Swiss-Prot record:
The lineage of its organism: Bacteria, Pseudomonadati, Pseudomonadota, Gammaproteobacteria, Enterobacterales. Pathway: Cofactor biosynthesis; adenosylcobalamin biosynthesis; adenosylcobalamin from cob(II)yrinate a,c-diamide: step 2/7. It is an enzyme of class 2 (transferase). It comes from Escherichia coli (strain K12). This is Corrinoid adenosyltransferase. Keywords: ATP-binding, Cobalamin biosynthesis, Cytoplasm, Nucleotide-binding, Porphyrin biosynthesis, Transferase. Signal peptide: none annotated. ATP binds at residues 36-42. Coiled coil: none annotated. The gene is btuR.
Length: 196
């Protein structure tokens, strides 16, 4: 490709991008969903949260399912004022106790609702929330109501497989991660600093 053709192509791209940027005038918080069966939902969410903290934004995190074991995200972000609330039972496939899992979910959900009502929080990350709805630990209607009633400027990030269609419809941005290849399938153990 000649330099002239390259410049012309890039100019067309610039015009399209500039037109889209000019159309985007609404300033408000958004709902972002990272879903699908591929790796990287939590990683993408925490990358966005880290970016927000780097710009001086106030962020709160609620982790469903993952338990209280240490993880790199928490080690990095808590010293920067990010509040973490974690479902105490951990992986529900380990506990296999619906009653205690539901109670633990409801307890940490109270913190999530508090954060979703807190106008001082610029962002709330609800890691693995989709499972709580899918497993009927939380009523969908209650989750949707809390999302709808949050402060206007607050952004919410939701992660997890199998996101309910009502939450997908409510979301402004949805990314579905698709598995192509995963080291775990080849027998490679989850690695500190990579997977948690």
């Amino acid at each position: 490709m000649s330099d002239e053709r390259y410049q012309q192509r890039q100019q067309r791209v610039k015009e399209k991008v500039d037109a889209r940027v000019a159309q985007a005038q609404d300033e408000r918080g958004i709902i972002i969903v990272f879903t699908g069966n591929g790796k990287g939902k939590t990683t993408a969410a925490f990358g966005t949260a880290t970016r927000a903290v780097g710009h001086g934004k106030k962020v709160g995190v609620v982790q469903f399912i993952k338990g209280t074991w240490p993880n790199g995200e928490r080690n990095l972000l808590e010293p920067h004022g990010v509040e973490f609330q974690v479902m105490a039972t951990g992986f529900t496939w380990d506990t296999q106790n619906r009653e205690s899992d539901t109670a633990a979910c409801r307890e940490v959900w109270q913190h999530a609702k508090r954060m979703l009502a807190d106008s001082s929080l610029d962002m709330v990350l609800l890691d693995e929330l989709t499972y709580m709805v899918a497993y009927d630990y939380l009523p969908l209607e209650e989750v949707v109501q809390a999302l709808n009633e949050r402060p206007h400027q607050q952004t919410v990030i939701i992660t997890g497989r199998g996101c309910h269609r009502d939450i997908l419809e409510l979301a402004d941005t949805v990314s579905e991660l698709r598995p192509v290849k995963h080291a775990f399938d080849a027998g490679v153990k989850a690695q500190i600093g990579i997977d948690y």
